[in-house]
Amino acid sequence: MFKLGKSVDIKCDREELFRFHLNTNNITVISPPFPVVSDIKMSSNPLAKGSTVDLTVSFILFKMKWFLEVSEVLENSLVRDTQLRGPFKYWVHDHIFEEIPGGTRMTDEVRFIPPFGILGLLALP
């Protein structure tokens, strides 16, 4: 299993940033530019524990459906999404919100097993 993480300090109230992440209208704002995410369907707005997210992920040569579930929500602290079906053998993504002087530290942590066995390792950053 692999783990990637990245933190960013944002001059914003922790509760406000947490609510921003749960608002489904903001998914395109918080998604990276690659891979391209489209055909997004979410079961609720705002997201809550048990909400589902269905989307299409476009890589250079192919598209793939990805089904996620919001598996845990800790008020103003954590949003966890877990892959139900998609490109990875295993995928758990945590958005962690921590109050710091002057704002909020948001940390993204992803634990995953790449697809395609050893060939999947070629796709790692």
Where does each model-flagged region fall?
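Beta-strand elements of well-folded, non-transmembrane domains
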Residues: 10-12, 57-61, 72, 87, ...
